[in-house]
UniProtKB/Swiss-Prot annotation:
Keywords: ATP-binding, Kinase, Nucleotide biosynthesis, Nucleotide-binding, Transferase. This is Thymidylate kinase. HAMAP family: Thymidylate_kinase. GO terms for molecular function: ATP binding; dTMP kinase activity. InterPro entries: P-loop_NTPase, Thymidylate_kin-like_dom, Thymidylate_kin_CS, Thymidylate_kinase. CDD domains: TMPK. ATP binds at residues 10-17. Phosphorylation of dTMP to form dTDP in both de novo and salvage pathways of dTTP synthesis. Belongs to the thymidylate kinase family. The keyword ATP-binding applies. It catalyses: dTMP + ATP = dTDP + ADP. GO terms for biological process: dTDP biosynthetic process; dTTP biosynthetic process; dUDP biosynthetic process.
């Protein structure tokens, strides 16, 4: 594929969604063809699945059901939106991808990273991100940001206890240990301006490495 696939990962409240859109805008201004998208979601079918997964009333959802729904949404999003964009040579910036499932369901939910990776391999095949930008923030700080953001409608994961979010952070640390080559870490506790500068630098380096 001729494009570049960059994913944005991190715990709740890390600010990656805001930075992703700003980075996409900068790339577009610089003359690049960009697709900014998200998981779960990005297309109609996957957005419907997102509504099921994140509905605050669905507290009885089994962890395996949750993992399978994420994988299903990921598959449809991949074949309908991500792969075509990469084949067209676009830069794809995606808010969450497989690493979220590994950290949230594999580690925090206790299903096992290897098991969840296997499920997702069936969904995505061999396609992995070229670069993954991890937004590092203390879980308590992330939750505080969510609580202070009146414009954000809290979803089922936002409402989890602090311990769950701490497990997610540990899960990401384990995932980064397994795939160290493609991860770039950003201190998300900094100002938006500093975080964006760091992210833009990472993306520029990736463009040079891939001769884009």
């Amino acid at each position: 594929m001729n494009g570049l696939f960059i994913t944005f990962e991190g715990p709740e409240g890390a600010g990656k969604t805001t930075i992703l859109q700003a980075a996409a805008d900068q790339l577009t201004k610089n003359g690049h063809s960009v697709l900014a998208t998200r998981e779960p979601g990005g297309i109609e079918i996957s957005e419907r699945i997102r509504e099921v997964i994140l509905n605050p009333s669905h507290t009885a959802m089994d962890p395996k059901t949750e993992a399978l729904l994420y994988a299903a949404a990921r598959r449809q999003h991949l074949v309908e939106k991500v792969k075509p964009a990469l084949e067209e040579g676009k830069i794809v910036l995606c808010d969450r991808f497989i690493d979220s499932s590994l950290a949230y369901q594999g580690y925090a939910r206790g299903l096992g990273i290897d098991e969840v990776f296997s499920v997702n391999q069936f969904a995505i095949g061999s396609l992995m991100p070229n670069v993954t930008i991890y937004f590092d923030i203390d879980p308590e700080e992330g939750i505080k940001r969510i609580d202070l953001n009146d414009a954000r409608e809290k979803n089922r994961l936002d409402l989890e206890k602090l311990h769950f979010h701490q497990l997610v952070q540990k899960g990401y640390e384990e995932v980064m240990n397994r795939f160290p080559g493609r991860f770039r870490i950003v201190d998300a506790s900094q100002s938006v301006e500093l975080v964006l500068k760091r992210v833009n630098n990472i993306i520029e380096e990736a463009l040079k490495e891939n001769q884009l």
